[in-house]
Amino acid sequence: SKADLVEWRADWFEDVFDKEAVWIVLNMLRKIINDMPLIATFRTKKEGGAAKPCSLSSYKQWILWVIGNGQADLIDIEWSAGEETAAELIQAAHAAGVKVIMSNHDFEKTPSDDVMTDRLMSMALSGADIGKIAVMPHSGEDTARLLQVTARMSRKLACPLITMAMGS
């Protein structure tokens, strides 16, 4: 069946910090997918991405390039970028009509219910359009806790949520 949307994981792109190359890819993607929604994601190394480690200023610059290009419908902003950076990037995205997915990934464990709840609440309060957490369960109970937090927060928050239990 046909895809509902496309996500470009730019951290896999060799020229990710070359503005012209990034704009060429975004423009090509838009021509290929037409009006299908496009999510642009640069996953940092600390959040499990394929790119080399980068500074916060390089990360912010990439996000602003993508927003300025106008081809992405949604942009992924990492919760770990911090409150001040997130606020600046969310404001820029919304001013350009770009929706924001705020994401957080824990590759070691499933955090406590309180931590997962606080992260999702923080994402919603920041102005993110969609909150996303991905965790690493070590038991069926961990997966059940994630589902319970997701159900509880879906009822409490106005923004949609994406949650996932990762693993092999």
Show the residue positions of the predicted features.
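Active-site beta->alpha loop and helix N-cap motifs at the rims of alpha/beta catalytic domains
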Residues: S1-A95, K99-S112
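Catalytic alpha/beta core domains of metabolic enzymes, predominantly
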Residues: L74, W79-S168
